[in-house]
Amino acid sequence: MIFVQQFEEVRLILEKAKKITVLTGAGASTESGIPDFRSANGLYADANVEMYLSRGYYNRSPKEFWKHYKEIFQINTFHQYKPNRGHRFLAELEEQGKDITILTQNIDGLHQVGGSKHVIDLHGTLQTAHCPKCKTGYDLQYMIDHEVPRCQKCNFILNPDVVLYGDTLPQYQNAVKRLYETDVLIVMGTSLKVQPVASFPEIAKREVGATTVLVNEELTGQEYNFDYVFQNKIGEFVEGLSSRK
């Protein structure tokens, strides 16, 4: 009964909120079939992955970098992944006129494909790359079609738009600015282990005074920073909210 009441309370909070911010992690995409790269059996379990995905490796060996980049993220098959119920739910909130911004740690671009327009890609995106000289952008299909993608104008090897090891987070300040404006922070599908993003719930709860909601299958160790905790898959959480209408 308490569980049902929590769903109803969160539904009403979202209904009344002026500004909603959503932080998403791997759990938002695993329901689309995308592997959790940071899981025990994920791609990041390979000790060499951090080197292959580093800024230094790209600078030293850009051709080899692209070979490993494509293998690690399996970009040749990436078109098969589609937005799931969680992605659509967030897009629907926006369509209803809600001021909602998504801060995502995911690099798959599925929030945008699912219809969300206000997305801050904290770790960049697999969907695009750009020329390091003239800044011309190229899409995923171009990367798939070229073994080592080069700029058609400059012939420079493209720079991926994923944030690499050794890079700063270019969108970090924009994300924090949004946190300080928000009424509600929903954290979905992340273990909150990677800094500086792991500090976002504490900022929202302790400094901003926002209502905070956690949706994650596993406990994070940060439950004290949340007003509501749902130990569910995101699809289950969305279904629980929908059934309260």
From Swiss-Prot:
Homology family: Belongs to the sirtuin family. Class U subfamily.
Requisite cofactors: Zn(2+)
Organism: Bacillus cereus (strain ZK / E33L)
A Pfam family the protein falls into: SIR2
Protein name: NAD-dependent protein deacetylase
Residues given in the record as nicotinamide binding sites: F37, I107, D108
Family annotation (PROSITE patterns): SIRTUIN (PS50305)
Catalytic residues as annotated in Swiss-Prot or TrEMBL: H123 (proton acceptor)
Residue positions binding Zn(2+): C131, C134, C151, C154
Co-factor remark: Binds 1 zinc ion per subunit.
GO cellular component assignments: cytoplasm
Compartment annotation: Cytoplasm
GO molecular function, one term: zinc ion binding
